Curated annotation (Swiss-Prot):
Pro residues biased stretches: 64-80
Ranges for region Disordered: 46-132
UniProt protein name: UPF0134 protein MPN_655
Any Pfam family the entry gives: DUF16
Signal peptide start and end residues: none
SUPFAM superfamilies (UniProt xref): MPN010-like
Ranges of compositional bias, category Basic and acidic residues: 117-132
Similarity section: Belongs to the UPF0134 family.
Length: 204
């Protein structure tokens, strides 16, 4: 996997593996291959609340076969005319650990792991931790959706009750208008009766 300022470049095989493990949903990871075939992961940054760096997918490239070492020449037979020659010193084997006069950490001493690198175990623990965080967030979202549904039901019920109150108020208003009309008619009748009584009681 290579990285530049614009995007990550990964193969289809790596992309499928990252999709299966949901890695690209949580954080950007750079895979570093060692000479002995082991892989270490470098966590670049979390992208939960940050924009993700785009990923460019390329075709898988077959690994080039390692060159074969030339066979050693056969040793000549031992005899008086051909005394045994001492074996030539073996060439030092290449190791992942740096050595030499400029490096005091040569030999079998294990180099300390830099802080920016993590082992596969630490990587899996980090991935599991993020999955747990996602699960908690999903549970909270589900609870919020339930609350929103209940609020929607309450609002709908209140809306229906308001409609019923409006209908009831309209009916009461019409009833009051009828009562007022009836009272007005009764007042008119009383006025007419009072006028008649005044005429009767007045002297001729």
């Amino acid at each position: 996997m290579s990285n530049n300022n614009k995007y990550f470049t990964i193969t289809k095989k790596q992309y499928k593996k990252m999709r299966r493990n949901k890695i690209e949903l949580l954080f950007n990871v750079k895979v570093l291959k060692k000479k002995n075939g082991r892989q270490k992961f470098k966590i670049l940054h979390e992208v939960e609340n940050k924009p993700k760096i785009p990923i460019k997918i390329i075709e898988d490239q077959p690994e080039s076969p390692k060159p074969l070492k030339p066979p050693k020449p056969p040793k000549p037979p031992k005899g008086p005319d051909n005394p045994e020659e001492p074996d030539s010193p073996e060439e030092p084997k290449e190791t992942d650990q740096p050595g030499g006069p400029d490096n005091p950490n040569a030999g079998n001493k294990k180099m300390p792991t830099p802080e920016e690198y993590v082992t596969r175990k630490e990587f899996n623990e980090f991935k599991d931790s993020n999955n747990q965080r996602l699960t908690k967030i999903e549970n909270k979202v589900d609870k919020l959706e339930v609350k929103v549904d209940k609020l929607a039901e309450i609002v709908q019920t209140q809306g229906e009750e308001i409609k019923e109150l409006k209908v009831e108020q309209k009916a009461q208003s019409e009833t009051l208008q009828l009562i007022l009309k009836t009272l007005q008619k009764m007042n008119d009748r009383l006025d007419r009766m009072e006028t008649r009584l005044d005429k009767i009681d007045s002297p001729k």
